[in-house]
Amino acid sequence: MKNVIVTGGNGFIGSSLIKKLIEKGTRVVAVDITFHGNRLPDSNLITRIESGVNTSLVERLPVIEYDSFYHFAWKGVNGADKADPTVQLSNIQMAVDCANICKRLNVKKFLCAGTVAENVAFSLSHLKKTTGGMMYGVAKHACRIILEDYCKNIAQQFVWMQFSNIYGVGNKT
């Protein structure tokens, strides 16, 4: 790979991936709402864009050929926002916006972060009451289904990466 985009680039998973990518000489455009408390090393292979993720992001990205777009940005992974359906729905829209950016820039592959928490969606019909945190898993599950369908319709190569519980230095979830 020569050029990639990583949303959530200053987050736990995004920054870890970026460090591995630059070790291999890959140029990375790291997108995050803030680089305060920067987790990324100084490298001429990294371009930082401090921005939210929506369709207007495409205007801020360098116009080059991209091999992959890794989407790790997701609001409300802990705290009260994890149970807020409005926040979780905005995350799904953000992921669809990323798919549209990929299509517009002819990015070869769109990779999106999922979670083992998606599996809660399969138990919902058997429960009388849920915990607020289940909304996060349900939203991730819905996001995957929407993206699988949408990316097929726009002919965008798509990979859903379902992670288990990930731990390490700097993880705040």
Report each predicted region and the residues it spans.
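N-terminal Rossmann NAD(P)H-binding glycine-rich loop of SDR-like oxidoreductase domains
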Residues: 4-24
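Conserved catalytic-core motifs of eukaryotic protein kinase domains, centered on the activation segment
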Residues: 40-41, 79-86, 121-125, 172
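Conserved Rossmann-fold NAD(P)-dependent oxidoreductase catalytic core, especially the SDR/UDP-sugar
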Residues: 69, 96-135
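Flexible, glycine-rich beta-alpha linker
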Residues: 119-120, 134-135, 159-173
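Active-site Tyr-X1-5-Lys
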Residues: 133-159
